[in-house]
């Protein structure tokens, strides 16, 4: 007997087409079962089909979805989840045209977050991150990548990673941990970036032993770390058994996309300034292009990543929030879907695949997340919508009714979130 049977699903978005990364026409294809049903037993999906095919199945609990839509839990493959403080005091300065470097000199910018993160205890960081995870869950997200990077020293980076490990045990959302110690060059290492990167590399063996990070990331950009420094750093991390990511070409066409494809990174993220050559190399690789249009929007920039061109040329595109306190303070991945549709010229079908299938592959979870398939974890979302296009079309609000994580209800609209975490 099943534990739970969901019936009368108007559109069941299984996302279950070919295995592997979705490209070109596959990105524009959504497998949908009309009048669908899903069976769950011991936290695992055991039946996927039509309501007619589900007749005769017995379950302890039968849930009538009222003709509404059900999808897999969404996957957010790029966040800066664990941090101290906030930066709303900088908004007025930005609107006045105060340059970012001047804000930095006043102790703001990333330095403000670094200082607040250093001062916070691990438990304070955990409680704050729980608040944000609760919000992500309410937007339908069940798997999240979480980066460190607001320490720029060993003690605080460890604290962030340990906080992420604790959150993995205490919150329903599955977390994938990324070490981003190479987020910026600290003042004390100005002009000595290679020495700083070596210091970060020296932390990796113990990090691997304690299983505190699965990925290593670096910010490859003008004035931060060069392409050659980034490649050398990430290749050494790969030698130590880590998978790698790269913040690439966010501002300038520096060659980060090319580097990511060349070294076999799991993903290249941002890519606003990616060159034609970089896009071509990504299309011929298994590196996912994780686009972060919410960041471009919040920074009030004119030029967005060329998502339409990337998809047309065969790049596997994913979407993420880039949730962070400075350049994209939102947990709302549904808003990101809307921005991607409007500014990256992605279709609703492409947007859905970019927050499920391809986003799961961007964090090496393609075999466990992003699809509704027999044998997979029952990470499901019931939407207050009757078709998939409505979600990115009606922007700025959450359309989520109920979220199941491993077969258990983790969020229901109108009821208190699972935790009592406060910001």
From Swiss-Prot:
Catalytic activity: 4-imidazolone-5-propanoate + H2O = N-formimidoyl-L-glutamate
Keyword Acetylation attributed: no
Positions that bind N-formimidoyl-L-glutamate: 150, 324, 326
Binding site for Fe(3+): 78, 80, 247, 322
One of the record's GO cellular component terms: cytoplasm
InterPro entries per record: Amidohydro-rel, HutI, Metal-dep_hydrolase_composite, Metal_Hydrolase
Disulphide bond pairs: none
Location (main, coarse): cytoplasm
Compartments, as annotated in UniProt: Cytoplasm
The protein's enzyme class: hydrolase
Alphabetical keyword list: Cytoplasm, Histidine metabolism, Hydrolase, Iron, Metal-binding, Zinc
CDD domains hit by this protein: Imidazolone-5PH
Residues reported to bind 4-imidazolone-5-propanoate: 87, 150, 183, 250, 327
Residues the entry annotates as binding Zn(2+): 78, 80, 247, 322
Single GO BP term: L-histidine catabolic process to glutamate and formamide
UniProt entry tagged with the keyword Transmembrane helix: no
Pathway named in the protein's UniProt entry: Amino-acid degradation; L-histidine degradation into L-glutamate; N-formimidoyl-L-glutamate from L-histidine: step 3/3
E.C. number: 3.5.2.7
HAMAP family in alphabetical order: HutI (MF_00372)
Functional description taken from the UniProt entry: Catalyzes the hydrolytic cleavage of the carbon-nitrogen bond in imidazolone-5-propanoate to yield N-formimidoyl-L-glutamate. It is the third step in the universal histidine degradation pathway.
Family in the record: Belongs to the metallo-dependent hydrolases superfamily. HutI family.
Entry protein name: Imidazolonepropionase
Originating organism: Bacillus anthracis
């Amino acid at each position: 007997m099943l534990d739970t049977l969901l019936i009368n699903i108007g559109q069941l978005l299984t996302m279950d087409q070919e295995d592997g990364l979705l490209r070109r026409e596959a990105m524009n294809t959504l497998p949908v079962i009309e009048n669908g049903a899903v069976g769950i037993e011991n936290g695992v999906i055991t039946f996927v089909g039509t309501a007619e095919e589900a007749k005769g199945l017995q379950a302890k609990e039968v849930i009538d979805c009222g003709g509404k839509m059900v999808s897999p839990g969404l996957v957010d493959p790029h966040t800066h989840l664990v941090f101290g403080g906030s930066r709303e005091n900088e908004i007025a300065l930005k609107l006045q045209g105060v340059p970012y470097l001047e804000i930095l000199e006043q102790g703001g910018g990333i330095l403000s977050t670094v200082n607040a993160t250093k001062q916070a205890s691990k438990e304070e960081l955990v409680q704050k991150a729980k608040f944000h995870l609760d919000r992500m869950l309410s937007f339908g997200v069940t798997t999240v990548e979480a980066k460190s990077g607001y320490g720029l020293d060993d003690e605080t980076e460890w604290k962030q990673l340990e906080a992420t490990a604790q959150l993995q045990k205490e919150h329903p959302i599955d977390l994938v941990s990324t070490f981003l110690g190479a987020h910026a060059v600290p003042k004390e290492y100005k002009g000595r970036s290679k020495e700083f990167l070596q210091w970060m590399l020296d932390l990796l063996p113990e990090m691997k032993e304690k299983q505190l990070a699965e990925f290593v990331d670096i910010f490859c950009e003008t004035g931060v770390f060069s392409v050659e420094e980034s490649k050398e750093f990430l290749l050494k991390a790969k030698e130590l058994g880590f998978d790698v990511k790269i913040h690439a070409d966010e501002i300038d066409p520096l060659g980060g996309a090319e580097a990511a494809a060349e070294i076999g990174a799991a993903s290249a993220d941002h890519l606003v300034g990616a060159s034609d050559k970089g896009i071509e190399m990504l299309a011929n690789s298994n590196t996912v292009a994780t686009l972060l249009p919410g960041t471009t929007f919040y920074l009030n920039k004119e030029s967005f990543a060329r998502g339409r061109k990337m998809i047309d040329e065969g790049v596997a595109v994913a979407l993420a929030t880039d949730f962070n306190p400075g350049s994209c303070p939102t947990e709302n991945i549904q808003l990101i879907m809307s921005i991607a549709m409007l500014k990256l010229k992605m279709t609703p079908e492409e947007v859905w695949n970019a927050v499920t299938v391809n986003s799961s592959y961007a964090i090496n979870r393609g075999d466990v997340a992003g699809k509704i398939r027999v044998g997979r974890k029952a990470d499901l979302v019931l939407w207050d919508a009757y078709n998939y296009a409505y979600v990115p079309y009606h922007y700025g609000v959450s359309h989520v009714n109920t979220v199941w994580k491993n077969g258990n209800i983790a969020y229901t609209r109108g009821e208190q979130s699972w935790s009592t975490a406060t910001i």
